[in-house]
Amino acid sequence: MKNISFICLFLLLGVACQESNAPKSPVRESKTNISVPPNFGDYWYQGNAELSSYTLEQVRYGAVHDGTAVLVFVTEPFSKSRQVKIDRPEGGKDELTVLKLNKTKSFITGIYPYQLMNSTFSPVEIGDYPKALKSATTVQEWCGHVYSQYNLREKGYQWRSFSYFESEGDQEKNLAEPWLEDGIWNQIRLNPESLPVGDFEMVPSSFLPG
């Protein structure tokens, strides 16, 4: 990889991930007239992932730290009710195809490392489901770690966060239905015309700002 900031290297690789358990809950549909381009499957339905690698300059504790950032995009079958990857050959009416983004940041502050990862799942059927169904973030460093997750339910997003730090602790909130900044990366890949315009509410990224 060339050490040039914000120049990405695209690779193709096969990806396989395991399913995990998640609570069941209905998801509300929101109809629009926007869809993915007709040739979407020529690139995204070939059983491969798109990997983009970046050099990173991360601000933390009042200083700029060098590191690496990686974006991995891939399509996969997804359960609407459980909001996990479907491993069954036929998922039936519960199955949606999503564009998943796994993004990571790795950098060192002083003597100890930071590892961050976010996974965001956006339905390819953006005409029926214009917003991300799920977004989960983990932050690990030597003091402790934090995990947070958004799930789109019938009445909006359910947000849960679990933290090592007393000031954050375990939290749970319900949000009407804002846009998630972490979902914008997928919106651009699916169809830039699906991006929100005008006045709207957006939840900032769960990642540390760059």
Predicted segment positions?
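Sec-dependent signal peptide recognition
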Residues: 2-8
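C-terminal motif of bacterial Sec signal peptides marking the signal peptidase cleavage site
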Residues: 15-16
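Contiguous hydrophobic, core-forming segments of folded domains
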Residues: 28-60, 72-73, 96-209
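Charged, amphipathic alpha-helical segments
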Residues: 80-86, 98-99
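A glycine-rich, acidic short-motif signal
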Residues: 89-95
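Bacterial Sec signal peptide processing site at the extreme N-terminus
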Residues: 19-29
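An N-terminal, globular interaction/scaffold subdomain
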Residues: 65-78, 86
